[in-house]
């Protein structure tokens, strides 16, 4: 049977076909009126169609410019010259500026630059110091505040600039924005950092005191390709076998003597050696930590995070910290948060091994960025005029707007650990419930650094070919005897968990130091175990990442493990599961259990780790449970 197209759709097609070129408002109204007169059968159709046409076609009929490209250079305060590409409208007048400072080659910003310039922005993409066409030496984070300040003020003074400068981009490009913002250049008017960190020790290089080995090795190797004119491709390819390294061969990084380090590291990535030399949160890190400088940020910020991103925890802390401690009312009240499904390299409908439905594919980073600056710089009343927080809720697989983050209505709920025999592997009897434990046995396992628990998915970067990120079936890990498993019964109704997740763990070890890992998992009726979020804590940093404190073997300690955040509806019939172990390799380096620096140690010992869950040691997973509307 032939289906008739709705009147609104036919009208939209006619008007937008006629109005391929920019039209004035009165012309649009006339065309819309005429089309409605032809196709609308009643007043309701007329009103609906006219509203649809005007809202949609006004967007398409916004002034569009031809774009010119030119190359420019600017001198920093110390005399170093940085080079940039400038995309701008071929028109007289002055326009707001959107600036990106990147270590990944300025030619990579073309797609957004052309789109934004055609929409009435001057777009500047600059190679940061020591990268590609810019002069100087690249050293992570060190020059980004001063160079960012100088570049913003140079951009604001260009003859075609109206004096308003915004910044955009993700990962290290997000870091260049944050580090520029804490220097508060007068003409910086907004930033849009995407998937970036808040602390370059505890959310970039380390987590819970453990070294982010996979990210740091793969990212550093990728950066070195430009530094050495891409001749170190063989080093990048070698990463493919990193997880198969001889696990009993030590030391892993023999860099205590710089002459012992590989030449490719000392000459191409000297910062890597410094990261290893500063395992604690000391002044080396504090001077560049965004968390230490929230009060210096004076501009509105759109923070874009992703549930499976390697910097998710830091992105959310940026939003919370600037909203609470920003240096101006405009900053505190101008915070917006957008949390997508996906990982560090982007999103889409299918992430890892999970299909999140058509709504997941709606996110477009370039579109969101442009809307943010249309709202901020041009006063366009778009989605950013509404609630400040927008998140993707997994399980329900839909977007939702919120008043704030974390959600005020989320109820902190303790799910206590239980077992009657032993919770080791899927063959054990570990369980989770809201009932507090009384008298129960302990659970134990042996952690052998030569046989670590392998990383399967999760927040990974930057070599997806060899170590695919995102949600993946965790059953291979859960079959191991050195992984403790605690599960709820199948839920009788949909249960939402949205917000920060943590684990209060009472445990002891036979070693002076070890790691404890935790992973939150959604288990479907078919057994598929989808990882949601995870965390790690190196025992020596249980009190503070600023100072190491070894354990007394056999003594019970309380450990608090930060699993970052999630938003997931555990559907009816699904189970919620917690995995506990002592390694997640090669995402994190292995703790050798000796108390030595893992990067330099030559020996290792196995550790027998014991988890307590009784009345005196109520180990519990703390979840933000959200009641349905």
Which ranges hold each PLM region?
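N-terminal cap/lid segment of alpha/beta-hydrolase-fold proteins
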Residues: 62-90
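Accessory cap/linker subdomain of secreted extracellular hydrolases
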Residues: 118, 182-296
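C-terminal, loop-rich substrate-recognition/catalytic regions characterized by aromatic stacking residues
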Residues: 242-259, 353-629
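Short beta-strand/loop motif that positions the catalytic acidic residue
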Residues: 303-305
